[in-house]
């Protein structure tokens, strides 16, 4: 199962999965990707849980 959490450190709309993943690693998540959230793309961090 994968648990997802919106990044707390990522600023602004998310257009780059690699940037998102880099920020997520600083938040102790192994990976992250951009996902649509209403009208804005946000960075979501993922880990196995």
From Swiss-Prot:
Family named by the database record: Belongs to the DEFL family.
Chain segments annotated as transmembrane: none
SMART domains according to UniProt: Knot1
Gene Ontology BP annotations: defense response to fungus; killing of cells of another organism
Keyword Iron-sulfur part of the UniProt annotation: no
Disulfide bonds: 3-49, 14-34, 20-43, 24-45
Any matching Pfam family: Gamma-thionin
Alphabetical list of Gene3D superfamilies matching this protein: Knottin, scorpion toxin-like
Protein's name in the database: Defensin Tk-AMP-D2
Organism classification: Eukaryota, Viridiplantae, Streptophyta, Embryophyta, Tracheophyta
Keyword annotations of the record: Antimicrobial, Disulfide bond, Fungicide, Plant defense
Keyword Disulfide bond tagged: yes
Annotated organism of origin: Triticum kiharae (Wheat)
Function: Plant defense peptide.
């Amino acid at each position: 199962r994968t648990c997802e959490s919106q990044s707390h450190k990522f600023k602004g709309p998310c257009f780059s999965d690699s940037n998102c993943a880099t920020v997520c690693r600083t938040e102790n998540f192994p990976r992250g990707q951009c996902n649509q959230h209403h009208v804005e793309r946000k960075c979501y961090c993922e880990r196995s849980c």
